[in-house]
Structures are given as C-alpha cells and as structure tokens.
A protein has these predicted regions:
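Oligomerization/assembly interface segments of phage tail-like spikes and tubes
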Residues: 58-74, 87, 151-166
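Charge-dense, low-complexity intrinsically disordered segments
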Residues: 1-8, 94-98, 102
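Amphipathic alpha-helical interaction segments
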Residues: 52-55, 73-76, 118, 122
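Acidic-leaning, charged glycine-interspersed low-complexity segments
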Residues: 37-42, 97-163
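Small/polar-rich, solvent-exposed N-terminal microdomains that initiate assembly or binding
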Residues: 1-59, 123-127
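A solvent-exposed, charged loop/short amphipathic helix patch at secondary-structure junctions
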Residues: 74-100
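A hydrophobic membrane-anchoring alpha-helix module
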Residues: 156-182
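Short conserved micro-motifs at the rims of enzyme active sites and ligand-binding pockets
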Residues: 58, 76-79, 171-173
Length: 182
C-alpha cells in the first residue's frame, strides 16, 4: 500500500529543506508579487510559488516555481577589487550583485541536488536511502532575475516538479455507499 503524499506533505518538505540549508534565512509561499520585501529583514529568501499538479498512472507531480534571492547593496565608497581589474567590462556598478548571483545559484543547485539524491531524505527520517519519498527528474533551466521588485534584489528562479507515488485508491473516499448512477 502506498502512503500517499498530500500537498501539505510536499510543501512542508520543501520548507524543511530550506530551513536546514545554512544560507537560507527566510522562506515564503504564494504568489511572488505578494511578498513585501520592505518588511523582510533576513535574506537569503527562498520563495515557493505553487503552479500546478499533474497526474500519472500511479503518481502525482507537484509543480512549483522556486525563487532564491538576496538583496543587492550599493555603496558610494566601494572601489573595484584590483584582482578583478581585467573584468571591469563585466562589472558595471560598484555593488555585490555578481556575488549575490553566484551565491544564490549555488543554493539553487544545492536544493536541486537534495531532491535528486535520496541521501538527504535518509538524514531526515527515512530509513532506506534507496526508497525516496520525494524526487525530481529532468533537466532544469535556471533563470536570473534582478530588480524585479521595488528593492534592489536579484537571484535565480526555476521550475521544478516533485514526483510522489499515489495509488488513487477509492476505498476511503468520503462518499455515501450508494452508487452515483441513475
């Protein structure tokens, strides 16, 4: 018998994964435009936007859009690093935007890796690392964004499908015993 995973199970697992990552300081769920970045004080932020659920013969795929972002700081007194003097064409402003892109991309790849490899799930209470409860497949397109919001903020966004088993059993559906046919 399959222990079907619900939307809450999947979402709470993603949030728990974010909580255990030492660089992620805040999490949120919902429409990305509902985030009030002016009130947010702790970054890096991982935001989960649920997009859809698709069914297979014996599985559900919960689809999410995941944002990993941090604040960009600009200071008038900053000077360019002499080690990067050859890369001045790449660095147009005196800010930490390049570092933010670098760090948030690493967090994104960490997050994908935790879902691709069941070892992480084993550390979180699953006895057999060969029996993942949640997993993902396919390749991912990770897209950068910057200044998408009111604050100077940048990071990466990607779409991910979380596959879980579901046996679509009909024995415990809360309906009356009578048939539905006329």
């Amino acid at each position: 018998m399959v222990n079907n995973k619900t939307y809450n199970n999947v979402l709470n697992t993603l949030l728990r994964m974010a909580e255990t990552h030492s660089q992620i300081k805040s999490t949120s769920v919902g429409d990305i435009f509902d985030i009030n970045l002016e009130k947010m004080q702790k970054f890096v932020l991982l935001h989960i936007n649920p997009t859809s659920v698709t069914t297979g013969d014996s599985q559900l795929t919960y689809n999410f859009q995941i944002f990993v972002m941090d604040m960009v700081t600009e200071k008038a007194g900053w000077t360019k690093n002499n080690q990067n003097a050859n890369f001045t064409k790449l660095v147009k402003t005196l800010s930490n935007e390049q570092d933010v892109f670098n760090e948030t991309l690493q967090i994104v790849t960490d997050f994908i890796g935790m879902l691709r490899h069941s070892t992480r799930q084993s550390l979180n209470g699953v006895d057999d690392i060969n029996f993942p409860l949640y997993f993902t497949q396919d390749q991912f397109t990770i897209e950068p964004f910057s200044e998408r919001f009111d604050n100077l903020c940048c990071g990466w966004v990607f779409n991910i499908g979380i596959l879980v088993q579901n046996d679509f059993q009909t024995c415990e559906i809360p309906v009356s015993i009578r048939g539905a046919g006329y």
